[in-house]
Amino acid sequence: MQLHGGFTFDDAAAWMPYLHALGVTHLFCSPILQASPGSTHGYDVVDHSRISEECGGEEAFQRLSQAAHEQGIGVVVDVVPNHMAVPTPIWHNHALWDVLRRGPESAYAEWFDLDMTDSQAILMPVLGNRIGRELEHISFTTDVINGEEQPVVAYYDQVFPVRPGTEDLPLDELLERQWYRLAYWRIGSEELNYRRFFDVDTLAAIRVEDPAIFEATHRTLIKLHAEGLIDGFRIDHIDGLANPRQYLADLQRATGGCWVVAEKILEYDEVLPADFECAGTTGYDSLLRVAGLFHVPGSVPRLTDLWERMSGSGEGFASTVLNAKRTVVKESLFTELNRLVNIAMAICDGDIRLRDHTRRQLNHAIRELLYQFSRYRAYVEPGRATPESEREIIVEAATKAREYLTIDELDALDLVVALALGETGEADMGGAVTLPAPSKILNQLPGRAHNPSDLRAEFMVRFAQTCGPVMAKSKEDT
């Protein structure tokens, strides 16, 4: 059930007798945590400690759960571990507000997947034009934020915090001294320095691979499960996580073995890794096969002809998807590509054996490898041997990518493949690099890794996280 302010927990509870009469065994609820004001879907969470007030709050959810259980209906809740909302105004997301206000001194400084290389300010691409043309619309004022009067920077309906100690500066200097940077919305696709859900700037990724962040963001849902109000969880966009396998293991330990399914799009011959501690996927793979029953095989030529005439393209589907991937990576996901290139360049700069790969060569090699992935991602982890099945996915993509590269770019591709697999690179393509434990690597603020092992681990994780959005925004959307 899609829950929101127009269809609350109590509204849903009234339907339980009817659903029971239909033979329904379980109720699947959209995310129930506090979302952005006016949210119609709940995937834009702003507060993990509260149940949606617009849907009625925790007491109303208790009534819904009770009504469902009285009819013998279990309750499954959608969990959004990958991201939080960047709402308008931002103070609705207290964690993000505090990071923008206090920077590295914030208690939430490590929550968000930030690229703080070279001490960049966090980009906030909200301005309608270049900042020089918008200064007259930006003002310093005060506002009551969560019951506390605070100095703020205001821009129309947007409100931003002010770094303590900068309140008395002239506006232009004050803006320069903040932990964030107000910018023209059009530059977000090129310069954004926080990971996000696909290409959506208003959904900022969080780092549930950190045990403390996992606990803080899941505490409320785990409590409701322990109280018997929730019977199972559906995990949204599991491929966005740094370590999906570890996340599922953490959730099982925290809940004592709860029933869990993961939103995972499996390609036709793909199977879920055997060590994923869940009951299976949400069923997209089953739906693919069931939908096939409603298609007459002999009609494929007619449907293909219709598609070609409507699209104006004589290309087959595979070529169309490949072209879509090229567009997506060069445009919508440029900032993600740029981050990978920056990490690869830093690795090369720090290891004399790997130098003399140019930025252009690495850029092209990374792009082509992303284009040729046949699945949403390979499940690789720093410090853990890569299963042969996952290695084959990357090697297969690399084999296809080689057809599009020059000789110099082929050398760069070999390095990129080695990094994606967690190997040492050109100096030793066959052996695995000795990496710190995943908890040590992933508990550091991304972008602040300095030693070679940490940079390699970061590339390994970031590359895997980028593959999914490329597939989703090309093949899935196409």
List each language-model region with its residue ranges:
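Acidic/aromatic-lined carbohydrate-recognition and catalytic surfaces
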Residues: 1-191, 195, 227, 237-303
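Short aromatic/hydrophobic contact patches that present stacked aromatics
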Residues: 2, 205, 232
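A generic short-segment signal for beta-strand/edge and adjacent turn/coil regions
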Residues: 44, 201-203, 230-231
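Flexible, glycine-rich loop/tail regions that form catalytic "lids" or insertion modules at the edges
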Residues: 167-225, 241-249, 258-478
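A conserved hydrophobic secondary-structure block that centers on an alpha-helix together
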Residues: 223-233
